[in-house]
Amino acid sequence: FGRRIGAKEEEAFFIGDGAGKPTGIFNATGGAETGVTAANTTITFDDVMDLYYSLRAPYRNKAVWLLNDSTVKAIRKLKDGNGNYIWQPSVREGEPDRILNRPYRTSIYVPELAAGKRVMAFGDYSYYWIAERQGRSFKRLNELYATTGQVGFLASERVDGKLILSEAVKTLDVKAAGK
């Protein structure tokens, strides 16, 4: 139950539209502010650097990158003018890689690289507030599956979430096709 509830919460907190669910960080209305708009679906290192500096310095101290695995892959493939990869893996054992010396987290619910999408966020997520409106409840459903000899369970929870200070998190948006 915990994994499924956690996955649904993660999805809502990242891409929820605020209608009967939390307002997600990547929602264009009520979510994070746009920091940078990439010209196309090929992200450049300049785009990443511009996103970093679009976030005000006080928020950078606790900032974390949030992106999809496909975006991490695109960033890892970036090369300098001499053909060397810009991404440098961690040199300390047990310490994860970083982007511009800040940690990153991936989620399947962060939109993938595509035109018109917000594909990456950078910021201090302590300004995303989560409220539990009611505790988790579990119900055993004996009768529903009695004819097949099975027992069902129903879990429910009511939560809400919203970025209360939109300037604390910035996104990298990809320009919509044809614009």
Predicted feature locations:
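Structured, hydrophobic secondary-structure cores that serve as assembly/anchoring elements
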Residues: 1-179
